[in-house]
A protein has these predicted regions:
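Surface-exposed, hydrophilic segments of mature proteins
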Residues: 2-5, 36-242
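Membrane engagement elements in two modes
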Residues: 2-46
């Protein structure tokens, strides 16, 4: 009889011990799935590339150009001496260093016409485009022609406006520069449109391409992204209302 009672107590004790172990395991498992870690002062944020193009007509008031901004007049009547100029600067509005280049639009449209001699022509073949850094608005068209004389070239799709990639750190902006398009006074009747078939050009604009620059450092140096794939932010400013 005593032996049976002892066995019964042992079984009950063992069962209680097993239940306690199970309860502890359940509690531990619950803790694994609900445990959290947080910091009160650190914010983890992915770097972003954000390039903006600012434009001005007077070097005083600046506006952000969008894809709908028209920087040049599509309705211009191009003739010898006629000049259009816009002042630009590129801004790094992101939190990563970037490098950019600027070029003339690939997507402008040129329609051929007939000149007063009856010959076919395209007006863009007689237009010049050039750039110049400037801190003030040019006083007259002659000053524009003189400033861009060293780098002007015939208007063409994707003409580069920068000689190389230019690096901007976060929050930094480029020096202001002028982009001018004009018809030289030396052009004659070869681009003098007949009333019936004038040549026209539309969609004149600027394209800015940017990619990440090798500036930020990790625990070793600033070359961690030197072999990263080149991803371009490409923004074109051609259409809309100026």
């Amino acid at each position: 009889m005593t032996s049976r009672k002892s066995t019964k107590r042992a079984l009950i004790t063992s069962a209680l011990a097993i239940l306690m172990c199970v309860a502890m395991l359940i509690g531990t498992t619950f803790a694994w799935f609900t445990d959290t870690a947080s910091t009160g002062v650190n914010k983890i944020q992915a770097g972003n590339l954000d390039v903006k193009l600012m434009y001005s007509t007077d070097m005083q008031t600046w506006h952000e150009a969008t894809e709908q901004t028209k920087l040049f007049d599509d309705n211009a009547l191009w003739e010898p001496g006629y000049t259009q100029v816009v002042y630009l600067k590129v801004v790094n509005a992101g939190n990563l260093a970037l490098k950019y280049e600027a070029g003339f639009s690939k997507n402008y449209t040129s329609n051929r016409g007939k000149n007063v001699n009856g010959d076919w022509y395209r007006v863009d073949n007689y237009l010049k485009i050039g750039t110049a850094e400037t801190a003030t608005k040019f006083e007259n068209r002659e000053a524009v022609w003189s400033a861009i004389a060293a780098n002007e070239r015939t208007l063409a799709k994707d003409v580069m406006l920068t000689d190389e990639w230019i690096t901007l750190n976060p929050g930094q902006e480029s020096a202001p520069f002028a982009v001018a398009i004009y018809m030289p006074t030396s052009v004659g009747n070869e681009a003098n449109a007949s009333k019936a078939r004038p040549s026209s050009v539309s969609g004149l604009g600027i394209e800015v391409r940017a990619t990440q620059a090798t500036v930020e450092s990790d625990s070793f140096d600033n070359n961690y992204d030197a072999n990263a794939a080149t991803v371009l932010n490409r923004v074109e400013y051609t259409d809309g209302v100026h």
